[in-house]
Amino acid sequence: MLDRADAVRKKTTDDKDLDKLDQCCGEAYFARALAYSELVKLFCKAYESDEDAAGQLGVILSQHYLGDETMRRASLKDSYQFILDDLDRAAELLELEEDFNTDTQGTLYDSIYFNEYTVHALRARVLLYMKRWDEAIKYATKVIDSGYYYLSSCTQAATSSASYYKYMWTNDFS
């Protein structure tokens, strides 16, 4: 899909269509990074260091899905680099306009679309898995300081008489 979308982007001249394509491509890169990050987390050893990760098995990486090439597992280091590269592309394509205004365009907190701050949040998580603490703090701080998102408090009332925590446990009917 990403290969086809890039080909369409090169042939499109209408700015409105280009914006839509950029959003779709950015979301696809983000979704692929998210999927690969979950695969790495579930099926690979923990990332200890760059030297160690270069010798550990990662996941099968593919940027295109055509042909009958032999699929081999990449190193853990290459797997994480693939995820970070996808996040770089996604951040570039999903960058918010400088004049984005939550008063007129709505909040990002309940948005159904990915944006540059969801990319920063995932990057912070991936960097935590890679034990790159300072970089993880940098990207998490970008999300927190953006003012577009807020943390929920377990003492904040979900109803007039219960905290989220109490509400969750007393009203779970599954």
Task: Name every feature range the model reports, one short phrase each.
Residues 1-30, 37-174:
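Structured, solvent-exposed acidic/aromatic patches
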